[in-house]
Amino acid sequence: MDIWEKLYTQAKKEYHPEDVTPFVYAHHVVCALESADGTTYTGFCIEACSGVMNLCAERVTALNMYVNSGQTKIRRLIAFRDEAPSGGGSGMPCGACREFLYQLNEENENMEIMVNYETREIVTLKDLMPNWWGKERYEQSRL
């Protein structure tokens, strides 16, 4: 079993769309990541009618990693709905998630994101955001 199969299998366990209440819907998008130390974490999307409660699976998973380990650096990430990513944009983090992952740790620009599970095609966060606006702030923080 390669790392991508492990991540897919763990994330798939979280996939069971449900109405938590008449206002909150969850588990319809799932995610798993491998942290810098090799530990895997999972999460799921949760949405509420108010809109401000909505959290994508990628952000929930990254927050699970941070809350449970204090880590912020991610090696690999897979996200999907009912099937593994199959190219054409399926499984790609939204703009808010991309931004959060970059802000969480600048080294996350090198994290691998699954594009097509079957062919093992990946991209990096840097591929998705080649001219990220926050690099300058990270550089200034090191002065």
What do these predicted regions represent?
Residues 25-36:
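Short beta-strand scaffold segments in enzyme catalytic cores
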Residues 45-59:
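Compact, glycine-rich, soluble single-domain proteins
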Residues 29-30, 53, 91:
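Gly/Ser-rich catalytic serine loop of serine hydrolases
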Residues 57-79:
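Short, solvent-exposed cationic patches
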Residues 2-21, 71-143:
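C-terminal binding/interaction regions
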Residues 39-40:
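Hydrophobic "anchor" residues
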Residues 56, 60, 96-99:
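Short amphipathic alpha-helical face segments that pack within enzyme cores
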Residues 34-36, 45-48, 82:
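Histidine- and/or cysteine-centered catalytic micro-motif in compact active-site loops
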